Amino acid sequence: MSIYSQTFLYLYRLLLFLPQKTGMRENISIIGRGIGQVMFQNNALSGIIMLIGIICNSWQLAILAVAGTVVGTIAASLLNYDKEDIRAGLYGFNGTLVGIAIGVFMEINIISVALLVIGAAISSWVAHCFRRQSLLPGFTAPFILVVWLLLITCHYLYPAILLPSLSENPDNASHFFQSFSLNIGQVMFQGNILSG
């Protein structure tokens, strides 16, 4: 069984434990809203459409995105954060981005999946810290801080897990539609025109 199949099975099992007293449909809506919140959309359908865009680029990144969303949401639920914020997907979207970043920057193996779980959970805690103060909005700062921490840690402790950097393709800048679509897709690390 591949790491992606195992991840999918774990996600399904974890999905059953999302905020208590809710059904499977509500749990799926929470996940959809969590993904949708990456683009400030408190709407499950928007999140599902964004997930389809990710799938157009990479089904593996889509699984990691859902995994990050589920872990971030479960962490918030276990830490008894505000239920309405959880239902709105406010603790899932940073996990979504952490999951995608793991797939973009790291080789997928048991260590990177463990880092995804740890990173998505910590991103919920950091998001909660931002929500408790009113001086500075958090937005994606929890994701950025957590991924920086993960990348720096891996760079010094386990550099073999990090993927090599890819060079840019200078031809894309000459085509407006391609560039526009690629830029929108890059919000979720998707390098595919259909994803944008």
What is each of the regions a protein language model found here?
Residues 72-84, 123-133:
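C-terminal ends of transmembrane helices
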Residues 2-81, 181-196:
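N-terminal signal-anchor module of multipass membrane proteins
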Residues 13, 17, 141-195:
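Long hydrophobic alpha-helical segments that form multi-pass transmembrane helix bundles
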Residues 90, 95-166:
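Membrane-interface helix-loop-helix junctions at boundaries between adjacent transmembrane segments
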Residues 8, 17, 40, 93, ...:
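Phenylalanine-focused residue identity feature
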